Amino acid sequence: MDTIFIREFKADAWVGIYDWEKLRPQTLELEIEIGIPGDAAGKSDDIHDTVHYGMVVERFAAELAEKRFGLLEALAEHLAGIVTGEFKAPWVRISVAKLGHIRNVRKVGVTIERTRETAR
């Protein structure tokens, strides 16, 4: 299986369980890997034979600006569902990190991996 990757995607999102986290959006950094089956796009040179990474970035940015999440795990799960559902990818790995959230720690976050069968 081939993989599309999106690295160091930064976006502001409403995420957190503490009252102070709910006052304003926080900047997150996402690392995304999307499985694409076979070599159809490489042979056809047609965007319709792959996952359009620009559309994924736009869709994620819209979701992160609009929705609120308590946990990074829930946010990552939601995004994985978009990739496997709307974009029909068979597999996705998403890492979501809060930047500078904990003193002396540059990033803290989660990584999830889902297939079309296991994503919600």
Labelled PLM ranges:
Residues 1-120:
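N-terminal, polar/charged subdomain of small-to-medium soluble alpha/beta proteins
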